[in-house]
Curated annotation (Swiss-Prot):
Gene: hemG
GO terms classed as biological process: heme biosynthetic process; protoporphyrinogen IX biosynthetic process
Keywords: Flavoprotein, FMN, Membrane, Nucleotide-binding, Oxidoreductase, Porphyrin biosynthesis, Transmembrane, Transmembrane helix
Binding site residues for FMN: 14-18, 90-158
Protein name: Protoporphyrinogen IX dehydrogenase [quinone]
Chemical reaction(s) catalysed: protoporphyrinogen IX + 3 a menaquinone = protoporphyrin IX + 3 a menaquinol; protoporphyrinogen IX + 3 a ubiquinone = protoporphyrin IX + 3 a ubiquinol; protoporphyrinogen IX + 3 a quinone = protoporphyrin IX + 3 a quinol
Organism: Leishmania major
Length: 231
């Protein structure tokens, strides 16, 4: 009797759907090239799946306004021991990674901070640029993201939809994930080269300031629109 194909659990946390698109792309490549059986699952439903039933696990999560989703953070906290005991990998998705000096685990502040604070030590980490969907955002998100993009030198045309993802990098990551050995050797905490705390706090503070200013801008614009309608 033929042996069953290896199974891979692929859990994603997405804000606007693009992280799932990336995960689906990786799953298709694995299925085509290695015949691995891939279960692509929203991490909100992750607890319905038993990690011990899989040979490998991949987690992918988007970042919005500097934060991963609560569902993603809670899942990792709950299952970090199981994740570290099996072949596991992780990728984050954020617009900051559109910049070449912000698209690795050591240079992307959000990813680096998460890994340094997490008890989980994935064997493989990727950072991918996300997508900008101005027409699909609600008013608040559109104004705030537009403001952040202006401050960071990005696209501010609210009619644009832009995918910044480097698909070649995604394919390389998929190949590296497929190559992870099934046996997990003891390993130290992943070396993400954390910068001094002051720098991290400064970076986080800057993003908080951007969020506050952006929210203020959104409120002001909303008030002006309401006032104009009443007038």
């Amino acid at each position: 009797m033929a042996s069953q194909s290896p199974k891979c659990l692929m859990l994603y946390s997405t804000t606007d759907g693009h992280t799932k698109t990336i995960m689906d792309t990786i799953a298709r490549q694995l299925a085509d090239e290695t015949k691995v059986r891939c279960d692509v699952v929203d991490i909100k439903d992750g607890n319905s799946y038993v990690l011990a039933d899989y040979e490998k696990v991949l987690l992918g999560a988007s970042i919005r306004y500097g934060h991963f989703s609560a569902a993603f953070i809670n899942y990792v906290k709950q299952h970090h021991s199981e994740l570290s005991a099996m072949p596991s990998a992780f990728f984050s998705v954020n617009l900051t990674a559109r910049k070449l000096d912000k698209n690795t685990a050591t240079t992307n502040v959000y990813t680096r901070k998460f890994l340094n604070q997490s008890s989980w030590s994935p064997q493989l980490v990727g950072v991918f640029a996300g997508a900008l969907w101005y027409p699909r955002y609600n008013f608040f998100d559109r104004v705030l993201i537009q403001f952040i993009m202006k401050v960071t030198g990005g696209e501010t045309d609210s009619t644009k939809e832009i995918v910044y993802t480097d698909w070649a990098a995604v394919r390389r990551f998929a190949s590296d994930f497929a190559a992870l050995p099934l046996a997990v050797p003891p390993r130290p905490k992943a070396n993400t080269v954390e910068k001094p705390d002051g720098i991290l706090r400064s970076g986080s503070g800057a993003h908080c300031l951007l969020a506050i200013v952006g929210m203020s801008a959104a409120v002001i614009v909303g008030i002006r629109i309401i006032a104009a309608k009443r007038g």
